[in-house]
Amino acid sequence: MRYFWVLLISLISIPVNAEIQPLKVITIRIGTIVPERSSWMNQIYRFNEFIKKETKGNLKFIWWTSGVAGDEPEIIEKLKRNELDGAGLSGMGLGRIVSDVRVLELPFLFNDYEEVDYVRSKISPLLSKIFNSKGYELIGWVDQGFVYFFSKEEFRDISQIKGKRVWIWKEDPLAEALTDGFPEVTPYFEKVTLLKKILDEGMVDVIYFPPIGVISFQLYYGVKYVITPPITYGLGAFVMKKDVFDSLPDEYKEVIRKGADEFFPQFVRDVRRETEESISALNKFGIKKVTLNESTVSELRNRMRKVYDGLIGKLYPQYLLTQVLSTLAQFRVERK
């Protein structure tokens, strides 16, 4: 009987107008070098709104854009120090977590997006597992589009680029390896966040960048020519720290996966479409398209194949390069 009265008094003591406490809002901090008002971020914010709506505002992604969190190597360091929970990265940043991923960005590897999509789909499960083993959750792939040379002066063959100062993304081992295939040029190593500055100040003559990025980063005033064909494919992805992702309620994890499955493929399609539109739009800024001689393209392909082999054991294992090349060759045969 005594316990009955204790229970009764406890129940009576609860105010009738007591409110149920709302769920704690979880904030995920994400860093990227992508400019705030770019097409890339416009796509990402659609994904953000989906997450917010599906979780009734209880899960929020806060993006530190425009390099506020630093260049990609600095973003990686912030992830390690738990100052960030996730990141939107290019292949350069992804490669600092899992260097194997750079096999998808080898120069003159892919001819079109169909080849990209096919090969990436075949090795994506393996790469996801490797990211997991490094403490990261691969949320979804995105695109930068194909990457082109942009130059202050016209060139159609290798002899015309001799002595030119070419920007190389600082601390990017793949970009540095490219200089082995271009002994004629003078590399200028600098952060991508300072690229506009050194371009405007005349410190470099040639850069490599996706067309949509040239517009987003406002690099068009510093160059006059876009050189075709593209030299490589630009990879991108959204990753989260695995411990952060694993700590989320299961329903939130499912929302993130659902959002990635729904929005990221559209993100990729839009970026690819806008890449083509960007090349046309750059004409309005006086940037002319120049095509390399066929003999030059052939020579560059041969040079870059030596770069592929030189990166075995440094960026990726032999078996992975073999798998990518054989998968690509098989796709080309089947598509004929």
Model-derived regions, located:
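Sec-dependent N-terminal signal peptides of Gram-positive bacterial secreted proteins and lipoproteins
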Residues: L7-L11
